[in-house]
């Protein structure tokens, strides 16, 4: 059994993560923590998330002393704000813990990226170099050796899973950048109340045009430029990405299907549509990314869907943990 501490368990992704780990046969949850200043400190997780009543009636402890909290801990999950993960991860790593960070604090190795897109100066370039990007279907060998796994963002997960087989297979025409239009549910903004996320205010609206931090994350790890436009949708959870591309001359629909099949035939958490494209309702509450496409001449449209809290966060973190420790990849997820 691996002793596990979850920091930031009070949030949406943190609660989903805790539920997955609670039913994992090789994980022992030794504590749930929140920041010392959190208004949730001292409350039961099940008081904040009533669906967990009778399942996870565990207290949320204020994290005051990291060295003390790390004693006897094998694995730490950080479902915390970017700046918080930036500060906490090196301390847990120094204590010998394996850390899975769901924030963006270690996803990109260029330290200048963080001051530009996250608003803080990165102080741990050594861990930026050592961190492994946890796109589970593509980084499994590196994940097996890593001490710090940076779990990808929600939009980058769907976007890269949809595009990477085609980019790596050199099937796309470089003269036209892939265009990613993606819509996310409101849970992607977290539990903290705000006017823009309130029931009567939420509509369907693009945001972060040319400035969203997930665009350079996608470009860095995909290895090709893209145009990315996120949208906030008036639903609770899920992401649907519609991606338009231009194919190289002579590339057929069968070539696209073959590339996806080759990439994901042994990847149980990516589901490929032989016909048609996926709908959001088929993935909400499940750990999958579903992918479908349509071709007309040299034009390709891909649709990828996922639950932003699961494959876009908690489920992928557990998937990475399973890979890291040699457990079945879907353990506790299916």
From Swiss-Prot:
It is found in: Cytoplasm. One of its GO terms (cellular component) is cytoplasm. GO terms for biological process: L-arginine biosynthetic process. It holds the Pfam family Semialdhyde_dh. PROSITE patterns: ARGC. Keywords: Amino-acid biosynthesis, Arginine biosynthesis, Cytoplasm, NADP, Oxidoreductase. The active site is at 154. GO terms for molecular function: N-acetyl-gamma-glutamyl-phosphate reductase activity; NAD binding; NADP+ binding. It is an enzyme of class 1 (oxidoreductase). It catalyses: N-acetyl-L-glutamate 5-semialdehyde + phosphate + NADP(+) = N-acetyl-L-glutamyl 5-phosphate + NADPH + H(+). Pathway: Amino-acid biosynthesis; L-arginine biosynthesis; N(2)-acetyl-L-ornithine from L-glutamate: step 3/4. Its EC number is 1.2.1.38. It comes from the Bacteria. The keyword Translocase does not apply. Belongs to the NAGSA dehydrogenase family. Type 1 subfamily. Catalyzes the NADPH-dependent reduction of N-acetyl-5-glutamyl phosphate to yield N-acetyl-L-glutamate 5-semialdehyde. This is N-acetyl-gamma-glutamyl-phosphate reductase. It comes from Yersinia pestis.
């Amino acid at each position: 059994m691996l002793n596990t501490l979850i920091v930031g368990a009070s949030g949406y992704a943190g609660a989903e993560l805790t539920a997955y780990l609670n039913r994992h046969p090789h994980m022992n949850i030794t504590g749930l923590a929140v920041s010392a200043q959190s208004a949730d400190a001292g409350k039961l997780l099940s008081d904040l998330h009533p669906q967990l009543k009778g399942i996870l009636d565990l207290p949320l402890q204020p994290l005051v002393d990291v060295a003390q909290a790390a004693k006897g801990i094998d694995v730490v999950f950080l479902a915390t704000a970017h700046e918080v993960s930036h500060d906490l991860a090196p301390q847990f790593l120094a204590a010998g813990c394996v850390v899975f960070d769901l924030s963006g604090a270690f996803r990109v190795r260029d330290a200048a990226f963080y001051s530009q897109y996250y608003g803080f100066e990165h102080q741990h370039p050594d861990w930026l170099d050592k961190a492994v990007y946890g796109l589970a279907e593509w980084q499994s060998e590196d994940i097996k050796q890593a001490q710090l796994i940076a779990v990808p963002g929600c939009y980058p997960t769907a976007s890269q899973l949809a595009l990477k087989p085609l980019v790596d297979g050199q099937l796309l025409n470089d003269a036209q950048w892939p265009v990613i239009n993606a819509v996310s549910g409101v849970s992607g903004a977290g539990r903290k109340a705000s006017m823009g996320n309130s029931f009567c205010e939420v509509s369907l609206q693009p945001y972060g045009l040319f400035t969203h931090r997930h665009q350079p994350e996608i470009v860095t790890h995909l290895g090709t430029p893209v145009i990315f436009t996120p949208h906030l949708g008036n639903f609770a959870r899920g992401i649907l990405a519609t991606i338009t591309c231009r194919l190289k001359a002579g590339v057929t629909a069968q070539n696209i299907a073959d590339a996806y099949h080759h990439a994901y035939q042994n990847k149980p958490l990516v589901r490929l549509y032989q016909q048609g494209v996926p709908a959001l309702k088929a993935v909400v509450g499940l750990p999958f990314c579903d992918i479908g496409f349509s071709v007309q001449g040299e034009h390709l449209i891909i649709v990828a869907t996922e639950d932003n809290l699961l494959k876009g966060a908690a489920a992928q973190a557990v998937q990475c943990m399973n890979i890291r420790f040699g457990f079945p990849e879907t353990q506790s997820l299916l």
